[in-house]
């Protein structure tokens, strides 16, 4: 499949400025868990960055909604594979989250077909991860289950996690000292690192 056709099918990829590679994003309003947490003071989703700034532009919202609708297209796996192939690093959902178990299974298939790419996916959707054996996840994908509240410890049901610290907390992500970029850090993609702690955005 040509990349032009793949972009038309999927709505294309995003290019987050801090990341070492492209990403796939969905509207934050469609988050199953995040849409509830955004109303909870002290939660990581309160004041969600994906509901502010450039994400509010009409053209950006239109692109996000196109990507959401594209998840139902039977050609989605093939098209996403065509777009990602050849990339060293990929991030799932710099905005948005897993929509269903079928969506997650389709992501697994894309990862299997792009075995030379390292994939990272943060999520708050415990309901779907609890239906998955971590041992069955493609080895080039790391899914980090994110804790819901600021300064909350990591969850204990999943081997890879992420947490968010208040400004005085024990943040491990170096991006704030690196012009808000990953730089040479690849901790989020590294299965040998059980938890990554971010500062509150």
PLM regions with names:
Residues 1-201:
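Class I S-adenosyl-L-methionine
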């Amino acid at each position: 499949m040509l990349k032009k056709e793949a972009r038309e099918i999927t709505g294309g990829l995003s290019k987050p400025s801090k990341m070492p590679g492209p990403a796939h994003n969905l509207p934050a309003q469609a988050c199953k868990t995040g849409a509830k947490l955004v109303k909870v003071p002290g939660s990581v989703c309160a004041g969600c960055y994906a509901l502010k700034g450039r994400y509010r532009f009409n053209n950006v919202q239109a692109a996000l909604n196109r990507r959401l609708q594209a998840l139902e297209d039977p050609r989605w796996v093939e098209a996403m594979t065509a777009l990602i192939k050849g990339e060293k690093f990929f991030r799932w959902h710099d905005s948005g989250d897993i929509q269903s178990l079928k969506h997650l299974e389709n992501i697994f298939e894309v990862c299997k077909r792009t075995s030379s790419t390292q994939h990272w996916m943060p999520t708050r959707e415990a309901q779907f991860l609890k239906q998955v054996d971590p041992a069955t996840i493609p080895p080039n994908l790391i899914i980090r289950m994110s804790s819901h509240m600021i300064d909350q410890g990591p969850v204990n049901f999943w081997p890879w996690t992420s947490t968010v610290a208040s400004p005085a907390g024990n943040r491990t992500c170096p991006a704030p000292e690196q012009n808000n970029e990953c730089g040479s850090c690849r901790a989020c993609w590294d299965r040998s690192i059980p938890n990554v702690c971010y500062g509150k955005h």
